[in-house]
């Protein structure tokens, strides 16, 4: 993987990441394709209509169904899905954490029961890497020990220690296997700034046979904490992350979350929000959120967002989307998802342009000003 910083404005960064499959201009939003597909969209939509340079797949879900070995036999995620650009795969730690009583964390790894059929499985750091090799993702996340917040200092400390040990085991396994995939470590520590520093410094210091991690992520946020506390935690963490490697904030979030994190030095983002909100009838616009089911759109011939040039806004009206949503037509999910993802992808492109031109603060001020014009659902 190649990485370069193109411009810095304050702490906001515009960078370029090159993998085997694509060039990624940051800040970047990565659509979530949990089961090797972004919900309601296919690879052509992602490449030709949305021009997304990278999407996510999920190790936990793909391991259980259809199985990572099957995907490997069918050409990895790129051959299997038809999406020929970059894939990042999560380790499955968050999904295991979400299983509640059906999961057990030990120093060796994670025992869990499948949400599909109740069968019992074990993820070690090494096994997760092997699964990700079968998926052949461009960027592989290591297994981490994610905990609920708030939590005790003892449990947060244990999470950091275990996450660091698992990261080192992952790095050793990766180097010894001699594969070319890129490996990212995940910083934990809850919302305790000192624990975040310890976690970041511990992970950054890890090396094996001269190899270190290709990038670093901030994990364990956006799990119920107040927004400002999340922003403060990010701000307390990024100074301890290498300047010459990508910085990824996992599972975040709203447009506001993204612009605040960019201001604090983050490069990469993912979240299910654009597609989930689309399916539920909430569409992102320059001025706020539009609830498409509202009766006032029944005869509205205007596009979702007059400032948007996405495929949906160029070709279809609010009235048509209102009808499709109420009729529960499957076409609605595709058109709405295209719009919301375009909004996110275009949003980070605009942020990048502002950074390159040295006007990030002005762009941020304008962003909030436009949303304040109609902060309620329109």
From Swiss-Prot:
Pfam families: TGT. The active site is at residues 90, 270. Transmembrane segments: none annotated. Its EC number is 2.4.2.29. Residues 251-257, 275-279 are annotated as: RNA binding. It catalyses: 7-aminomethyl-7-carbaguanine + guanosine(34) in tRNA = 7-aminomethyl-7-carbaguanosine(34) in tRNA + guanine. Gene3D superfamilies: Queuine tRNA-ribosyltransferase-like. Substrate binds at residues 90-94, 144, 188, 220. GO terms for cellular component: cytosol. Its cofactor is Zn(2+). One of its GO terms (molecular function) is tRNA-guanosine(34) queuine transglycosylase activity. Zn(2+) binds at residues 308, 310, 313, 339. Pathway: tRNA modification; tRNA-queuosine biosynthesis. InterPro entries: ArchSynthase1/Queuine_TRR, TGT, TGT-like_sf, tRNA_ribo_trans-like. Binds 1 zinc ion per subunit. One of its GO terms (biological process) is queuosine biosynthetic process. Keywords: Glycosyltransferase, Metal-binding, Queuosine biosynthesis, Transferase, tRNA processing, Zinc. Belongs to the queuine tRNA-ribosyltransferase family. PANTHER family: QUEUINE TRNA-RIBOSYLTRANSFERASE. Catalyzes the base-exchange of a guanine (G) residue with the queuine precursor 7-aminomethyl-7-deazaguanine (PreQ1) at position 34 (anticodon wobble position) in tRNAs with GU(N) anticodons (tRNA-Asp, -Asn, -His and -Tyr). Catalysis occurs through a double-displacement mechanism. The nucleophile active site attacks the C1' of nucleotide 34 to detach the guanine base from the RNA, forming a covalent enzyme-RNA intermediate. The proton acceptor active site deprotonates the incoming PreQ1, allowing a nucleophilic attack on the C1' of the ribose to form the product. Homodimer. Within each dimer, one monomer is responsible for RNA recognition and catalysis, while the other monomer binds to the replacement base PreQ1. This is Queuine tRNA-ribosyltransferase.
